[in-house]
Swiss-Prot record:
InterPro entries: EzrA. The chain crosses the membrane at residues 5-23. Its main location: membrane. Keywords: Cell cycle, Cell division, Cell membrane, Coiled coil, Membrane, Septation, Transmembrane, Transmembrane helix. It comes from Staphylococcus aureus (strain MRSA252). It holds the Pfam family EzrA. Belongs to the EzrA family. The gene is ezrA. This is Septation ring formation regulator EzrA.
């Protein structure tokens, strides 16, 4: 037993030793990778990067940047790369002692140092590329500025007439660019690449602005010297022609406004000559806005005249229509009020319409007199005609509505008479059906309903004979009588149908009297109720008796009665 225990312990020890050696082998591979990485980063071309800067002009800012980067290289090597060798050596020693965690910490530290070293290299590479790119950008901007300088100078010289009095100032501004180009060369020669970049970039923007001025100035001069004066002249003579045609354009104030605009225009060219183009554009925009306002007023007058010519005849027709309709209404009201009740407010409205129409006609006459003058402000005439048109339209609508009301009075009377005749005819027809039916007697309530209808009809007939007739009240009463008649007819139909149905049920049930005493008893009760005009109750008892001996038969009998 002891032997087995000893063997087990030995096996466990061997396994543990094997695991330790396996782990050390894995850790050894990590250390080897760190060594390989160290060898790789030692070859990073720090010096080659700096060599690119040495090809530039190592003065001023460039020299300062070069020295700083060179110093950073030394510091990076001493701070990040030099300690790596020691860290790796420590890791190997600890690994030999099977101190895995401590060895791993040393390797991690070594990797962090190498990361920092690589970052330092990457930062140096970016800085070098940035400096080289800035040098290249500076040279490109410089070449462009030189070309622009020559072209701008040539353009002013060749097209001096297009720039007017601004040509001299343009030449002066262009000449200022030459010493600034030379200043760039000095900054570049001194190695001050950042100052050189800021200088040439600012110069390029100023050249762009002056170039835009050179493109804009000929357009501004053309507008100032030709286009606007031409528009002033066209507007002046155009208004003169319109006045000859009869237009009143005093409110446009053409002469005074044009004189004011000419004065304002005279300040534009000096602004252009001083290259104050923003102020010049503002003044031109203001002049154009005022011109547009004048054109709008004139165009409004022309359109107003066309509108006046189109609407004048329409308004004339509407006024005559209103006057004729008013006369017709006055005559018709006097005739109609003898036969029909008419609200006094309607008669007053007609008289009021007469006064309003006469007032509108007077206004229209004044407008026509105004239009006969040698100078007419058609916009005012248009507004006045619109006022007339709106009011006469309202009057015509109201008069037509009143006229339709008078016509409707006759139609309503005829309709009421026709409805009353139909009520009388229908009432007699329904009552005859009640008398000719199988009813033992006409129920008293139908006699009462018939008498009430007769009374209402006589009352309405008496009102028809009276004058003047209040048509609305009469029509309402006839409508109530029609409702009474419909109720009378509906209830009579129900009673007639129920009486036939009850009789059919009793007749059908006679076959069961001998065999079923309870059926015989129920049918006797149904006959008694039938004789007393209680048809619905008779139906209920007869249906119950028949369903007890022959289920479903009552539905069949009811369908036959409905078909009849």
């Amino acid at each position: 037993m002891v032997l087995y225990i000893i063997l087990a312990i030995i096996v466990i020890i061997l396994i543990a030793v094997g695991v330790l050696f396996y782990l050390r082998s894995n850790k050894r591979q990590i250390i080897e990778k760190a060594i390989e990485r160290k060898n790789e980063i030692e070859t990073l071309p720090f010096d080659q990067n700096l060599a690119q800067l040495s090809k530039l002009n190592l003065k001023g800012e460039t020299k300062t940047k070069y020295d700083a980067m060179k110093k950073d290289n030394v510091e990076s090597t001493n701070k990040y790369l030099a300690p790596v060798e020691e860290k790796i050596h420590n890791a190997e020693a600890l690994l030999d002692k099977f101190s895995f965690n401590a060895s791993q910490c040393e390797i991690d530290d070594a990797n962090e140092l190498m990361d920092s070293y690589e970052q330092s290299y990457q930062q140096q590479l970016e800085d070098v590329n940035e400096i080289i790119a800035l040098y290249k950008d500076n040279d490109e901007l410089y070449d462009k500025c030189k070309v622009d300088y020559r072209e701008m100078k040539r353009d002013v010289l060749a097209n001096r007439h297009q720039f007017g009095e601004a040509a001299s100032l343009l030449e002066t501004e262009i000449e200022k660019f030459e010493p600034r180009l030379e200043q760039y060369e000095v900054l570049k020669a001194d190695g001050n690449y950042v100052q050189a970049h800021n200088h040439i970039a600012a110069l390029n923007e100023q050249m762009k602005q002056l170039r835009s001025y050179m493109e804009e100035i000929p357009e501004l001069i053309r507008e100032t010297q030709k286009e606007l004066p031409g528009q002033f002249q066209d507007l002046k003579y155009g208004c003169r022609d319109l006045k000859v045609e009869g237009y009143d354009l005093d409110h446009v104030k053409v002469d005074s406004t044009l004189q004011s605009l000419k004065t304002e225009l005279s300040f534009v060219e000096p602004l252009i000559s001083r290259l104050e183009l923003e102020e010049a554009n503002d003044k031109l925009a203001n002049i154009n806005d005022k011109l547009d306002d004048m054109y709008d007023l004139i165009e409004h007058e022309v359109k107003a005249k066309n509108d006046v010519e189109e609407t004048k005849d329409i308004i004339t027709d509407n006024l005559f229509k209103a006057k004729d309709m008013n006369y017709t209404l006055q005559t018709e009201i006097e005739y109609v009020r003898e036969n029909y009740y008419i609200n006094e407010s309607d008669a007053q409205s007609v008289r009021q319409f007469e006064n309003e129409i006469q007032s509108l006609i007077s206004v229209y006459d004044d407008i026509l007199k105004e239009m006969s003058k040698s100078a007419v402000r058609y916009s005012e005439v248009q507004d006045n005609l619109q006022y007339l048109e709106d009011h006469v339209t309202v009057i015509n609508d109201k008069q037509e509505k009143l006229q339709n009301h008078l016509i409707q009075l006759r139609e309503d009377e005829a309709e009421a008479e026709d409805n009353l005749l139909r009520v009388q005819s229908k009432k007699e027809e329904v009552y005859r059906r009640l008398l000719a039916s199988n009813l033992t007697s006409v129920p008293e309530r139908f006699i009462i309903m018939k008498n009430e209808i007769d009374h209402e009809v006589r009352d309405v007939n008496e009102q028809f004979s009276e004058r003047p007739i209040h048509v609305k009240q009469l029509k309402d009463k006839v409508s109530k009588i029609v409702i009474q008649m419909n109720t009378f007819e509906d209830e009579a139909n129900d009673v007639l149908v129920n009486a036939v149905y009850a009789e059919k049920l009793i007749q059908y049930g006679n076959r069961y009297r001998k065999d079923y005493s309870n059926v015989d008893k129920s049918l006797n009760e149904a006959e008694r109720l039938f004789k007393n005009n209680r048809y619905k109750r008779a139906i209920e008892i007869a249906e119950q008796a028949l369903e007890s001996v022959e289920p479903g038969v009552t539905k069949h009998i009811e369908e036959e009665v409905i078909k009849q």
